[in-house]
Regions:
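Predominant activation on well-ordered alpha-helical scaffold segments within soluble catalytic domains
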Residues: 6, 17, 55-58, 62, ...
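Short, well-ordered loop/turn and helix-capping segments at boundaries between secondary-structure elements
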Residues: 166, 239, 269, 287, ...
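Glycine-rich phosphate-binding loops that contact phosphosugars or nucleotide phosphates
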Residues: 33-185, 219, 254, 262-307
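Peripheral docking tails and interdomain loops at the edges
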Residues: 304-353
Length: 353
């Protein structure tokens, strides 16, 4: 039987645990690079889900004393100058076939600067052309809508930040080990997250099936989760979907709300600003949901996962409900995700190699 998105989501716990277990070996080039020069500024080149993964991880880099500049590859290649102050460059493409990311990487290399490629396929065009290919240790997903690979990309970025901070003594060994232990607990908790989310989706399936517009908000690291909902809901559920930074939503986008919209509010712990916005928007839309790591559910429209972790690691948990909703809402709407559409798109537009 061919794997589905659900197959890969259910594998995430084991896959993430394996990445954590092997990260010192798989990311050895990062540690070696960090031992040779001080790393204060990193340029990340990414688009699509890879860009969203970078948004999820960026503030942990900042916590580790590393400024992050995230660029869309095409815009970077065509219109921007490469920052000479960047100490390290990472190009991200799960397939390793993104034409724009490859072009952006070559622009950096033409200036005599090495590039790390974070990919599920080190033998891909991006992996082969890079100076340091980094395997995210998931293999290639045969389903076009990656889930396991997204979570693995976020985790690998967090581990890269951790290795640099460790190598350059910005974290003590005990601090670093506590972060690793948290990541291990997250991986072990994912099966329970899946069980709770499945029950939540079943409870609200009528609302989710009938949704004609989905909007998500998040803050900090959870902006990446909201943006990934935008990307993947658009691909799978195939109705207009958007993800916003919490405060940005309050500066105009709220004006489009109507009685057919479904809204999701992501939080790692009870957040007064997010909950005030949800309370205000509830009368104006079809339904509002809170997805939180808090212990107690606010109401039956709240999925409370009851997991206490550092804010910077919360995307690894809260992305799982998004991934499960992608699969189940598509199914509820009668969309067969195994049937490819626009099959000649990459060939005609040359967006993938």
């Amino acid at each position: 039987m061919s794997p589905t998105m659900l197959t890969y989501i259910n594998e995430e716990s084991d896959v993430l645990a394996n990445i954590i277990r092997r990260h010192r070996q798989s990311l050895e080039d990062v540690s070696r690079f960090a031992s040779q020069k001080t790393l204060r500024r990193i340029l990340i080149l990414a688009t699509g889900s890879s860009l969203n993964a970078a948004f999820c991880a960026r503030y942990f880099f900042e916590l580790c004393g590393i400024s992050i500049d995230i660029k869309e590859p095409y815009t970077f290649s065509q219109y921007e100058n490469s920052d000479p102050q960047a100490d390290m460059v990472i190009a991200i493409s799960q397939s390793g076939k993104s034409a724009s990311t490859l072009e952006a990487m070559r622009k950096v290399q033409a200036q005599g600067r090495p590039v790390f490629a974070l990919t599920a396929d080190p033998q891909s065009p991006l992996g082969k052309a890079s100076d340091y290919p980094l395997d995210i240790l998931t293999g290639i997903e045969s389903v076009g809508f990656v889930t396991r690979g997204f979570s693995a990309t976020v985790l690998n970025l967090l581990l890269i930040a951790l290795l640099i901070a460790r190598q350059q003594q910005r974290l003590t060994e005990s601090q670093a080990e506590e972060y690793v232990a948290q990541l291990q607990r997250i991986a072990a908790t994912l099966p329970l997250v899946i069980v709770r989310t499945e029950a939540f989706i079943h409870q609200h399936q009528a609302v989710l099936r009938n949704g004609t517009r989905f909007v998500a908000t998040g803050y900090g690291a959870l902006v990446g989760v909201a943006k990934e909902l935008e990307t993947k809901f658009t691909e799978t559920v195939r109705v207009p979907s958007s993800g916003f930074e919490l405060e940005a939503y309050m500066h105009g986008p709220y004006l489009e709300a109507n009685a057919e919209h479904v809204m999701f509010f992501f939080e790692d712990r009870p957040d007064a600003r997010s909950r005030a916005l949800r309370e205000y928007m509830t009368p104006a839309v079809a339904k509002t949901f809170t997805l939180t790591l808090a212990k107690a559910a606010q109401d039956d429209q709240t999925l409370a996962l009851d997991v206490a972790v550092d804010h910077h690691f919360s995307p690894l948990l809260l992305i799982v409900p998004v991934q499960l909703m992608e699969f189940h809402i598509a199914s509820l709407k009668g969309i067969d995700l195994s049937v490819r559409i626009f099959d000649d798109f990459d060939r005609v537009l040359k967006s993938k190699i």
